[in-house]
């Protein structure tokens, strides 16, 4: 249903102190700007089948939300292609995207900013029905109440406003609004990260039930691997704009094949013995934002305890198939599997 090939989104900046070059030689201008490029999405390819949940996990700043927005054409791609039901959408005129806009929706992280404070719950849910002329005016209220039932909110809530709702209730309204157009595919962009842990589980279970009932496909984005594992059929791990690993959820959790995935698993509060790393638990040092701009080689080399030498610094590892439906982008998959212990070629950074 959704097919993404070599998708890229590059941001170019030409202002700011980090892009200023000072020339003291007197041969050129004293100050000049050096444009800087940031590859938020860097050559990603993936597919999502009808009724499938693909979880996309990674730290803040890795580009996962940007990927979701580019797939929905809320942001313009720099290169690559996205097909929905076999139809390319990236270069279609907006008028030709009406079917796509109805069939593909998004649930944002912060319902406070995605819900209009001036619209009641009922008005917010009815608005897509009017925009797409999905049901006669006389039937809109009945349809809106049915949507409230789907997300397990009392019908009396239709007269309430966002400020009168809890965080979980607001997110239920956002889900109901997304369901109003009867979509096939929903991008769930950190839909539970702003909620209490107890509420997170309830919302994730609700979304899983809706998937089963309506055969929905989700791109479920989160920084929390435990949340992603709860609902996903497959998991894709993203780092600095690219995919590190992708595979069936059970396989990713049981036998991760990329050091970054291992580190994410090790960061969970409860780790099964089968999920231990190659040589015990891995700690994740540093942050994406703290790293220098990468020129070549593996995008994870600055933090990887398994760094094997020059190949990691000079050659970008391809996403290599390890087993049926399981791929990882790591040079360790091409060296003898004799139990490589962490070398800490990069000293751990706090």
Model-derived segments and spans:
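ABC ATPase NBD coupling module
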Residues: 31-35, 89-105, 131, 137-138, ...
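Conserved ABC ATPase signature
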Residues: 161-165, 169
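Charged, flexible cofactor/metal-binding loops and thiol motifs
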Residues: 14-32, 248-349
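Conserved ABC ATPase "signature" region
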Residues: 22-29, 88, 139-156, 265-266
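Conserved ABC transporter NBD signature motif
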Residues: 80-88
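A short, proline-enriched helix->beta-strand linker immediately N-terminal to the Walker B motif
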Residues: 180-184
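P-loop NTP-binding/switch modules centered on Walker-like glycine-rich loops
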Residues: 187, 191-195, 199-277
């Amino acid at each position: 249903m959704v097919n993404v090939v070599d998708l890229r989104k590059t941001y170019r900046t030409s202002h700011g102190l980090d892009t200023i070059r000072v020339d003291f030689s007197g041969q050129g201008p004293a100050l000049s700007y050096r444009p800087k490029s940031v590859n938020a999405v860097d050559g990603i390819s993936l597919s999502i089948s009808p009724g499938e949940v693909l979880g996309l996990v990674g730290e803040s700043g890795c580009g996962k939300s940007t990927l979701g927005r580019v797939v929905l054409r809320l942001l313009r791609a720099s290169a690559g292609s996205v097909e929905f039901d076999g139809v390319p959408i990236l270069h279609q005129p907006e008028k030709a995207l009406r079917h796509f806009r109805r069939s593909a929706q998004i649930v944002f992280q912060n319902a406070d900013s995605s819900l209009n404070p001036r619209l009641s719950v009922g008005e917010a849910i009815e608005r897509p029905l009017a925009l797409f002329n999905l049901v006669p005016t006389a039937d809109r209220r009945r349809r809106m109440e049915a949507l409230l039932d789907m997300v397990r909110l009392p019908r009396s809530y239709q007269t309430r406003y966002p400020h009168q709702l809890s965080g979980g209730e607001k997110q239920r309204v956002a889900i109901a609004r997304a369901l109003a157009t009867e979509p096939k595919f929903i991008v769930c962009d950190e839909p539970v990260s702003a909620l209490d842990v107890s509420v997170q589980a309830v919302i994730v279970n609700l979304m899983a039930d809706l998937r089963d009932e309506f055969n929905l496909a989700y791109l479920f984005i989160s920084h929390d691997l435990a949340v992603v594992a709860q609902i996903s059929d497959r998991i894709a791990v993203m780092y600095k704009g690219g995919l590190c690993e992708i595979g069936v959820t059970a396989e990713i959790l049981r036998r991760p094949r990329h050091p970054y995935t291992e580190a994410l698993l090790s960061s969970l509060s409860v780790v099964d013995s089968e999920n231990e790393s190659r040589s015990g638990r891995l700690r994740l040092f540093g942050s994406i934002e703290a790293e220098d701009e990468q020129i070549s080689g593996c995008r994870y080399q600055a933090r990887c305890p398994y760094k094997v030498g020059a190949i990691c610094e000079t050659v970008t590892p391809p996403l290599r198939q390890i087993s049926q439906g399981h791929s990882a982008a790591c040079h360790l998959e091409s060296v003898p599997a004799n139990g490589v212990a962490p070398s800490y070629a990069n000293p751990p950074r706090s």
